[in-house]
Amino acid sequence: MRVTVSSAQVLPGGFELPLEPRLPRIGAVDQVALEERAASLAKRSIKKESKLQALELAVRMMDLTTLEGSDTPGKVAALAAKAIQPDPADPSVPSCAAICVYPNLVPAARERVQGSGVKVASVATAFPSGQSPLPVKLRDVEEAVAFGADEIDMVIDRGAFLSGRYAKV
C-alpha cells in the first residue's frame, strides 16, 4: 500500500508522508520457536534479589488508571492513595509513577498526589476512540495541560491508521 500526497502534506514534527518505511513490519510468527522459547524462559530460576528489584521497578513504572463514566473525585482520591502507598502494610513498597484520569479530574488528582512524587497523567484526543476532528483533539490536550497534567496519554484513530490514512492520524 502506498500513500500519495503532495509535498505540502507534512506532519507536525517534520514527518513527511508516506510513513510506511518508518512503520515497523511484523513478519510471520514461528509458533513452534515461540513456544520453545517460552518454555525455556519458564524454567529459568531468578534470584530473590533480582526478583525484588524487578518488582520494585515495575511498581515505580506503573500508572494506576480510572477511566470510567462513573469516576468521581472520591474515586480519584482512593486511586491516589493507592498509588502513593500501594501496600499500606509494607511502607517499603515504592510509589507508582502516576495516576491517569480524565481531564476534568486532573485538579482533584493533583491535589491528592501533591508532594508525593506521583505524577498525574490524563487521557486526551477523544479517548477511547480517537475519532474526533483534530481541533477537538487539540482542545482536549490543551484542557488537560491547563488543568495541570504532567503527562498526556493520547489515542489515535485506529480505523484511519489501519486503513492507511496516516495523515489523518
Enumerate the predicted regions with their spans.
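Short, mixed-charge, low-aromatic patches
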Residues: 10-15, 30-41, 95-100, 126-134, ...
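Metallocofactor- and cofactor-centric catalytic cores in central/energy metabolism, strongly enriched
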Residues: 20-31, 41-49, 65-76, 88-101
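Alpha/beta enzyme core
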Residues: 49-57, 70-94, 104-169
